[in-house]
């Protein structure tokens, strides 16, 4: 593939800039959430879903606010990454290969109206518009670690609901063994599609038990507001014990299939990107050690890297799914 040399250069891995902005205090973020929730309660008729729907129709910052209660089961005893870093340091190749490209170029994405087709081995296939999807289950905030295969990480306060809630409603058949996620591929909205980096559209997949795991989050917000375009608006999946590329963005199709689906990076380089791609400090990528990581906005070039945790620190939730598997073979 002609793009390989360029792509490898783009993935050099040590292009992490120092942040000049102090991360927002966690208490300040909580205060905003509580204020938004209080305003919604005072209104009587306006809840989290109403706020979200208004936000997609308006570029106004206040309208983009999204109230959701914090789930105390899902917190991280570490500093939350700043909103600036979360929204300006991204991998979203549909908008370019530089980390700053999504923030600069994703304004062309139109997140509303939006439809997600749920299809395949299910008894109740359905096409959800984003408004209906937002009303499917109660929203909550979860603070998760995000670990990129390139050796950097963040701590991010996502808003969404368990993917399992959607799965239960569509009733998978006994033939459904895997779930595939397909991202929008519209050249008029995504200028990066002109580069033959991957076989578009971008797709990812999970085993059914992984998709049903309580950690797997169908995500529509971050940092107390609806997802910015560069972070995968209007809906993405977050799988916190896997490397970031497994968490598909701007989803338009969710397919239930009977066999392991092709996924974009695994198809591109199966010896480098496994289907499972669980965070594992004992299995290195050919170009990046996975034993340690640099926290964006917090760990400078001269700060010792922090040790990477097995399953990104979520072993109590997920390790049993891989009992007996050779995780070096099934990486």
UniProtKB/Swiss-Prot annotation:
Cofactor: Mo-molybdopterin
PROSITE patterns xref list: TAT (PS51318)
Residues annotated as binding Mo-molybdopterin: 90, 93-94, 148, 183, 231, 236, 247-249
Gene Ontology molecular function: metal ion binding; molybdopterin cofactor binding; oxidoreductase activity, acting on a sulfur group of donors, quinone or similar compound as acceptor
Record InterPro entries: MsrP, OxRdtase_Mopterin-bd_dom, OxRdtase_Mopterin-bd_sf, TAT_signal
Keywords noted in UniProt: Metal-binding, Molybdenum, Oxidoreductase, Periplasm, Signal
Domain of life: Bacteria
Co-factor binding details: Binds 1 Mo-molybdopterin (Mo-MPT) cofactor per subunit.
CDD domains (alphabetical): YedY_like_Moco
Segment forming the signal sequence: 1-57
Mod. after translation: Predicted to be exported by the Tat system. The position of the signal peptide cleavage has not been experimentally proven.
UniProt keyword tRNA-binding present: no
Biological process per Gene Ontology, one example term: protein repair
Subcellular locations according to the entry: Periplasm
Matches recorded under SUPFAM superfamilies: Oxidoreductase molybdopterin-binding domain
One Pfam family, short name: Oxidored_molyb
Family designation: Belongs to the MsrP family.
Function: Part of the MsrPQ system that repairs oxidized periplasmic proteins containing methionine sulfoxide residues (Met-O), using respiratory chain electrons. Thus protects these proteins from oxidative-stress damage caused by reactive species of oxygen and chlorine generated by the host defense mechanisms. MsrPQ is essential for the maintenance of envelope integrity under bleach stress, rescuing a wide series of structurally unrelated periplasmic proteins from methionine oxidation.
Subunit-structure text: Heterodimer of a catalytic subunit (MsrP) and a heme-binding subunit (MsrQ).
Protein name: Protein-methionine-sulfoxide reductase catalytic subunit MsrP
Native species: Burkholderia pseudomallei (strain K96243)
